[in-house]
Amino acid sequence: CKSDFLMADENPENIKGPCSSLSEDGHQDRKFDYMITNPPFGVSWKAEEDFVKNEAKNPDGRFSAGTPRTSDGSLLFLQHLISKMEPKGSRIGIIFNGSPLFTGDAGGGESDIRKFVIENDLLETIVRLPGYLFFNTGITTFIWILSNNKNKNKKNKIQLIDAEDKY
């Protein structure tokens, strides 16, 4: 990644790591206009549980919407990105497997996080992608597109796109 930055005449110091974005916010005081990511599917955050749960207690903390099961940190990555949104408007594109859409009990951590995203009108679009886009797996994946500055005609709406057979 740093070599790509150097070849593009960008500052490689903007690349943080190796570290976990959950316990070590490498861009603590920064906000971004656009963010695109593909966090690892089903990554455990058990090793960072104490840190994450402590930050979740802070109403201004990155994880204040809730904490999911420790076996899947996908929705923690989403909350991390939401915390980096510019107040004047940002967009996020994030690729998930189906877990963030469907797992968790009503009133549980995953459900609370989804509720936060919807009640704050952040979710703009979910696109279901074709299978086998990722090497050696037919897992179904989804692109979530979020915005904190939706067009007026998209306010309080979520667009669902089924692109499963478009590949």
Q: What are the functions of these language-model segments?
A:
Residues 2-30:
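S-adenosyl-L-methionine
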Residues 29-167:
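A conserved structural/catalytic subdomain of Rossmann-like adenosyl-cofactor enzymes
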